[in-house]
Amino acid sequence: MALTVPGKPYTIAVKPAADIMEESEIFDWVQLNIGEYGRDYEISYDDEIELTVYYFPTEQQALLFALRWAQ
């Protein structure tokens, strides 16, 4: 699943947690704190689509992010 948010310079994608933890991947990690919905996610810039991509381990986490930040 991937969501491109209209008017925002990013897209949101779901990536299995096991894939996020690959040591061969180098990404910046940040902590998202939205009240009780604090989640870990991964950020990468995709040159092909020229957007920042936020990777989440579950669809639910991605949707929570989309609902909060697509406003």
What is each residue range found by the language model?
Residues 1-18:
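Short glycine-/aliphatic-rich beta-strand segments at the starts of folded cytosolic domains
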Residues 20-23, 62-64:
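Short, conserved charged micro-motifs
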Residues 45-71:
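Short, compact, well-ordered microdomains
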Residues 21-51:
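Acidic, low-complexity, intrinsically disordered interaction modules
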